[in-house]
């Protein structure tokens, strides 16, 4: 199934490209080896980009300003978009998602890019 467009997701092209680049790195399990980024859903990441969640990794890989994707997720929910991007970045509704592996995060991100909807519960059923 093809990805939704940046416009359909309410993202800028750089934000969209950063998420797609992050998906590729997560699916390959190569954040650390290729980009010097450790994955951890509990930590957005600093400007140094050493330990990051999905959003922080995307900002680092896409050379986006620190916190810009978190701001975008918050703004999207205010402008009629669902809370899906915000819930992808901050999965408070699925406590296990805070311990997601790169593989599980990739499933969650791929689902979001394909459907525009967040589904951490489904992603967490993916074997580690």
Feature names for model-found ranges:
Residues 2-128:
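Catalytic phosphate/metal-binding cores of nucleic-acid and nucleotide-processing enzymes, i.e., regions
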């Amino acid at each position: 199934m093809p990805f939704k467009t940046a416009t359909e997701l309410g993202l800028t092209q750089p934000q969209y490209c950063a998420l797609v680049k992050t998906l590729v790195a997560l699916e390959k399990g190569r954040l650390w080896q290729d980009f010097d980024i450790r994955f951890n859903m509990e930590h957005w990441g600093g400007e140094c980009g050493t330990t990051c969640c999905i959003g922080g990794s995307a900002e680092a890989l896409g050379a986006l300003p620190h916190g810009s994707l978190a701001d975008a997720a918050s703004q999207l929910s205010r402008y009629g978009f669902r809370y899906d991007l915000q819930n992808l970045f901050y999965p408070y509704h699925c406590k296990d998602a805070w311990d997601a592996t790169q593989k599980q995060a990739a499933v969650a991100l791929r689902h979001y890019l394909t459907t525009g909807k967040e589904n951490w519960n489904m992603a967490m059923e993916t074997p580690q």
